[in-house]
Design a protein with these regions (language model features):
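A conserved acidic beta->alpha catalytic loop
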Residues: 92-102, 120
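Conserved nucleotide-sugar donor-binding catalytic segment
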Residues: 191-249
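Short, acidic, metal-binding catalytic loop of nucleotide-sugar glycosyltransferases
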Residues: 76-85
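Conserved short acidic donor-positioning loop in nucleotide-sugar-dependent glycosyltransferases
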Residues: 78, 92-95, 151
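N-proximal low-complexity "stem/linker" segments adjacent to membrane-targeting elements
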Residues: 9-77
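Conserved donor NDP-sugar-binding/catalytic core segment of glycosyltransferases
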Residues: 154, 160-187
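Glycine-rich, basic loop-to-helix element that forms the pyrophosphate-binding segment
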Residues: 120-137
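Short beta-strand-to-loop acidic/aromatic patch adjacent to the donor-nucleotide binding site
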Residues: 142-154
Length: 249
């Protein structure tokens, strides 16, 4: 038997496009979709330690991402999150004059998205912009948890909320499974080893992430960050969430 949320969503989706994709009906469909996502994923963490804080949106999640002349898929995925207390910091790799009008319009449409740029293009897999992002977070952006991603990555709508639900007082970082373009978009079961996890899979407490820092500008910089997180808190304070909540592209 279908849940009420699923049935109502299906009913509204049968309306003509000029009705279902506008105004109050569109907002209702989005809300129902979010509720259905949370219903279907509730078994992942049946009794979240921070249930009340998550329900009240007390935690702020910061996402740091490089960007270079690309459409910000990441921003679209965050705007669609079931959890709305987040701030996205885009750091453009060099002057941003060539970023497209559509991308610029999307970035400017949401006050939770902050945009800065480096003085010169580094062209080092986005690591210099990430380092600048860490400096910006440390000096100017308050929050509780931090995620490092990339502008063309996609976080499924329940990513932020489900990752937060996995935390408790004995957990400093949570990581999830992913779908990866390098592996034909199949489900990729992550583990804390080189080539088996991407930084976009990981959410860490802000203080732990800043203490680890972004220290490597080589191709292996993503893994070095995860490795430095492990050095900061130890594997026992990492928790694995067995769900594919992140799409690397």
């Amino acid at each position: 038997m279908k849940a009420v949320t699923e049935s109502l969503y299906s009913l509204l989706s049968r309306l003509p496009p000029e009705i279902r994709d506008k105004g109050i009906v569109l907002r209702a469909r989005n809300r129902l979709r979010h509720w259905e996502i949370l219903r279907r994923t509730s078994p992942l963490t049946p009794n979240p330690a921070y249930h009340n804080a998550i329900k009240d949106r007390d935690f702020k999640v910061i996402i740091v991402s490089p960007i270079y002349k690309s459409f910000p898929v990441l921003a679209v995925s965050l705007i669609e999150q079931t959890y709305d207390n987040w701030e996205l910091l885009f750091v453009h790799d060099g002057p941003s004059g060539e970023i497209g009008d559509i991308a610029k319009s999307l970035i400017e449409s949401d006050k939770r998205i902050r945009f800065i740029e480096t003085e010169q293009r580094a062209n080092d897999w986005g690591h210099t912009p990430r380092q600048r992002g860490f400096q910006e977070v440390e000096s100017k952006i308050e929050g509780d948890f931090l995620v490092v991603s990339n502008s063309d990555n996609y976080h499924v709508p329940g990513y932020v909320e489900k990752m937060l639900e996995a935390f408790d007082d004995s957990t400093d970082a949570v990581y999830c499974d992913m779908s990866h373009d390098y592996y034909s978009w199949r489900n990729f079961h992550t583990r804390l080893e080189y080539s088996f996890v991407d930084c976009g899979c990981v959410m860490a407490r802000r203080d732990i992430a800043l203490a680890a820092g972004w220290n490597d500008n080589s191709y292996e910089g993503d893994w070095k960050y995860v490795s430095d997180l492990v050095d900061q808190c130890g594997t026992k304070r990492f928790k694995k969430l067995n769900a594919t909540l992140f799409v690397h592209s």
